[in-house]
Amino acid sequence: MKQHEAILDIQLKELKLSTFKSNWNDAEQFAISKNYSYSQYLSYLCGIEIDKRIGTRLIRMIKESKLPKNKTLSSYDFDSCKSINKDQISALAETDTWVNQAHNLIIFGASGLGKTHIASAIAYRKIELGMRVKFFQTSHLVQILQVAKQQFRLKEEIIKLDRIPLIILDDIGYVKKDEHETSVLFELICHRYETSSIIITSNQP
């Protein structure tokens, strides 16, 4: 390796441009073969860096979301359930207006309808568009909130979710109807009312 190349590697490492560091040489050869100008070469290399960062961020956001795997709109069988409006679901997935306005979405119906699939698919698309989401089995979240309440940190636990514009409460109908469980859930929903969005799925209307 030539001295200036070694220095460049050190500089790129210092700038935390790891994809630049790994690809500048191959990108240079490609740019030469295409007769790119210096600015075109730099733009091409920046594109590689950006694509890598977007991919890395997407992987991190999907992992953080705890969404069920392989639940996308393309994998949902709309033909098997004529009561589900594909265009309407697609519009909810593609547009951010309802989330920006802190509207909520309730998906209810009989078992086997694919409510969790639809909710997860909408949320997955939101992640692809750069939005943070979080999926919860409602009964599990209630347990977390109950423990937090016993430890006098319920408000703190609820506020932690403020950084997530969209959360999914799956199978809310399975939450026991006793006061302890419903009260913490009520506090969460009230806290997010008109500030952040929730998708709720349930077997009961």
Per-region residue spans from a language model:
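Interdomain "pre-motor" coupling segment immediately N-terminal to P-loop NTPase/helicase cores
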Residues: 17-69
